[in-house]
Amino acid sequence: MGKLPRPVPWLAAGENFPPLEFAWGRHDPAPGLLAAGAALDVPTLIQAYSRGIFPWFSLGQPVLWWSPDPRMVLHTEKFKLHRSLRKSLIHFLDDPECEIKFDSAFEHVIKACASQPRAGQPGTWIVPDMVQAYSSLHRAGYAHSVETWVRGKLVGGLYCVKLGRMVFGESMFAHQTDASKIALAALVGFCRAHQIAMIDCQQNTRHLASLGAAEIDRADFVRHLAQNVEKTTPPWQFEPVYWKQILTAEKPTLP
């Protein structure tokens, strides 16, 4: 028999998280699982994100907290503007009825992310408790949305957490082709304009890898986090000039 993984600690409300080294490893049943329990309130979420921990659980499960190793991140200078996305983005920018908005419809965005069908996932981890928790985090000024609007309709977007000069991506949705990717491009432009070098993507997916995200050691991620999470946070607003950070800095890649 193989070695049994370390028991997962159950946290009472307000209890501190265990050291990240206590998280289950890559050969355990649930790599990255660190703890269960605690509360999904604003102070707990801020403490968690400040240490490189995030909640992720399905309906009917307790709150589960994760810190995977390796960690999937997008270095903002490595964002891949594929030729097809560049074409979609230029078309979007040329249409006066298309625009990017920040934080105008946060709850609509998170609920749209929850209902977005995803390959290999029969349900969603954005359960009602998570919607409520991140809506509270949004009202407190830490959770934000990037929204793609076309002719007055919300057609795509993402939501994230921002602490200092760290951005933690959470989920995306699209009701039109490339709508979520355009939102991500806007976020990357914002980050580049404000010297935010890394967007946390949490876990590896083929979709994120295709856009330039890659895995790094958790220790490197936590080191970068510690250096940036306490820095002065830039105002959460989008300026059209940020597109220059994308269109002039990027050479389009195939396809």
UniProtKB/Swiss-Prot annotation:
It is an enzyme of class 2 (transferase). It catalyses: N-terminal L-lysyl-[protein] + L-leucyl-tRNA(Leu) = N-terminal L-leucyl-L-lysyl-[protein] + tRNA(Leu) + H(+); N-terminal L-arginyl-[protein] + L-leucyl-tRNA(Leu) = N-terminal L-leucyl-L-arginyl-[protein] + tRNA(Leu) + H(+); L-phenylalanyl-tRNA(Phe) + an N-terminal L-alpha-aminoacyl-[protein] = an N-terminal L-phenylalanyl-L-alpha-aminoacyl-[protein] + tRNA(Phe). Keywords: Acyltransferase, Cytoplasm, Transferase. GO terms for biological process: protein catabolic process. Belongs to the L/F-transferase family. PANTHER family: LEUCYL/PHENYLALANYL-TRNA--PROTEIN TRANSFERASE, LEUCYL_PHENYLALANYL-TRNA--PROTEIN TRANSFERASE. Functions in the N-end rule pathway of protein degradation where it conjugates Leu, Phe and, less efficiently, Met from aminoacyl-tRNAs to the N-termini of proteins containing an N-terminal arginine or lysine. This is Leucyl/phenylalanyl-tRNA--protein transferase. The lineage of its organism: Bacteria, Pseudomonadati, Pseudomonadota, Betaproteobacteria, Burkholderiales.
